[in-house]
């Protein structure tokens, strides 16, 4: 037997957690995610968005959303751009670990849509220019994974 999710979001309830730090990028990721959800049939009133200060704070609110029983999937969006210190490494590692851990602990998909880039140009490219919009891609993944995970409910 082959299991796969389909890309119809009708009837799905989705939570989105967005880091405000680098908002000029994360707002574009959010726009892409909202566009992706709506284009695939998720109703606007079935989407809740929570803004957090930065990427490091994403896992806590994603956990609260995922454990609420209200959502079929949670999308995490943020942008971490390497600077001159090791702060980048700590933030990236902890956010990735936090979201990955939630994905395994929760009964719903928690999608990692956090950009971790070396340069601001790379972040801009992934927020809707040359390299597509990772927010949109995260929305599509959330829809597919929500349906796929329900096959084992």
From Swiss-Prot:
Family as reported in the entry's similarity comment: Belongs to the DMRL synthase family.
Positions annotated to bind 5-amino-6-(D-ribitylamino)uracil: 21, 55-57, 79-81, 112
Family matches, as CDD domains: Lumazine_synthase-I
Biological function: Catalyzes the formation of 6,7-dimethyl-8-ribityllumazine by condensation of 5-amino-6-(D-ribitylamino)uracil with 3,4-dihydroxy-2-butanone 4-phosphate. This is the penultimate step in the biosynthesis of riboflavin.
GO BP: riboflavin biosynthetic process
Catalytic activity, EC: 2.5.1.78
Example GO molecular function: 6,7-dimethyl-8-ribityllumazine synthase activity
Name of the molecule in the record: 6,7-dimethyl-8-ribityllumazine synthase
Record's keyword annotation contains Transferase: yes
Pfam families linked to this entry: DMRL_synthase (PF00885)
Catalytic-site annotation from UniProt: 87
A single Gene Ontology CC term: riboflavin synthase complex
NCBIfam families: lumazine-synth (TIGR00114), PRK00061.1-4 (NF000812)
HAMAP family: Lumazine_synth
Sequence positions that bind (2S)-2-hydroxy-3-oxobutyl phosphate: 84-85, 126
Quaternary structure and interacting proteins, as annotated: Forms an icosahedral capsid composed of 60 subunits, arranged as a dodecamer of pentamers.
Catalytic activity from the UniProt record: (2S)-2-hydroxy-3-oxobutyl phosphate + 5-amino-6-(D-ribitylamino)uracil = 6,7-dimethyl-8-(1-D-ribityl)lumazine + phosphate + 2 H2O + H(+)
Domain of life according to the entry: Bacteria
Keyword annotations: Riboflavin biosynthesis, Transferase
Pathway note: Cofactor biosynthesis; riboflavin biosynthesis; riboflavin from 2-hydroxy-3-oxobutyl phosphate and 5-amino-6-(D-ribitylamino)uracil: step 1/2
């Amino acid at each position: 037997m082959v299991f796969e999710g389909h890309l119809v979001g009708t009837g799905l309830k989705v939570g989105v957690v967005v880091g405000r730090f680098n908002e000029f990028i994360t707002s574009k990721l959010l726009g892409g995610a909202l566009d992706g959800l709506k284009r695939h049939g998720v109703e606007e009133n079935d989407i809740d968005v929570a803004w957090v200060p930065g990427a490091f704070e994403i896992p806590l609110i994603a956990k609260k959303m995922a454990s609420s029983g209200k959502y079929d999937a949670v999308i995490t969006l943020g942008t971490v751009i390497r600077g001159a210190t090791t702060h980048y490494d700590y933030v990236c590692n902890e956010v990735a670990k936090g979201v990955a851990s939630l994905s395994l602990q929760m009964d719903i998909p928690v999608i990692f849509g956090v950009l971790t880039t070396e340069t601001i140009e790379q972040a801009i490219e992934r927020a809707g220019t040359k390299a597509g919009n990772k927010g949109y891609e995260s929305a599509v993944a959330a829809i597919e994974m929500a349906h796929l995970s329900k096959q084992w409910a």
